[in-house]
């Protein structure tokens, strides 16, 4: 029951977070800091008028920003498949791009429970 409530809550949060975010062609996520504690990062990715896809990434204590970015890229590729182009850039940065002809999309941080980790989103 607890997992069901958490899933419903995250879905509601993601729809609110996505609604407040602009849609763009490309997004850049910049990770800063290290994982002072274990936790998780949940991102919501949604195309125009599409339901958000949630990607939850478990993060182990002690990982640096480059290792965290790698884990996020792996989870995004797993969850999104070939819907978007996902690349790790400069170690700690992640680019998510739409494919030619596909609609613009939004990205939002739904949850970050990792102490010491900052996540900034930039539209491009």
Predicted regions and their residues:
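Short, linear, compositionally biased motifs with a strong N-terminal bias
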Residues: 10-11
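Positively charged n-region of N-terminal signal peptides that target proteins for export
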Residues: 1-4
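N-terminal signal peptide c-region/cleavage motif recognized by signal peptidases
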Residues: 14-17
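Polar, low-complexity export/assembly segments characteristic of proteins
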Residues: 20-124
């Amino acid at each position: 029951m607890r997992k069901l409530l958490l899933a419903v809550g995250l879905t509601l949060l993601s729809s609110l977070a996505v609604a407040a975010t602009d849609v763009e062609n490309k997004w850049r996520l910049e990770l800063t800091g290290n994982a002072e504690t274990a936790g998780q990062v949940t991102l919501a990715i949604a195309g125009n008028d599409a339901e958000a896809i949630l990607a939850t990434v478990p993060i182990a204590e002690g990982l640096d920003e480059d290792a965290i970015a790698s884990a996020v890229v792996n989870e995004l590729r797993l969850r999104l498949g070939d819907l978007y182009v996902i690349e790790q850039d400069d170690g700690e940065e992640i680019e998510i791009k739409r494919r030619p002809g596909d609609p613009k999309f939004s990205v939002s941080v739904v949850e970050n429970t990792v102490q010491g980790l900052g996540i900034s989103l930039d539209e491009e």
